[in-house]
């Protein structure tokens, strides 16, 4: 593929875009399956995990809620990058998933929450699997840390008295 452009920056951007498109094509050929894009799967997973977390208690509940938050950050980041209000988007997205509308996500083209599946917005399953695996592995590694090194409170030290080591004779 021959790429030409007015400047090196344009050529570099075109090269990156072509590389990305070729890698997506490769992923679809290797595993010919698609899933809805726009953060819809992450929003649904976040909803399901929150529902499950309500049945838990203690640290397990907190960990599950934080995992749901992390998943939900994907559609919210899409919304923010599209110039949408993230709070309004989060409320609307949660409401749609609460109504059982599992394919609702962020439609950047419409600038709102929409039925992503119905709009034909998809991404390769292979990419989604790798993202989820990497994120889950990172979270699991953090959770496996048994020991926490905490800095103890520093002991209060009194200034040395005159005549003691470090003190200046005659000082009060």
What is the predicted function of each stretch?
Residues 1-172:
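Extended, low-charge hydrophobic alpha-helical regions
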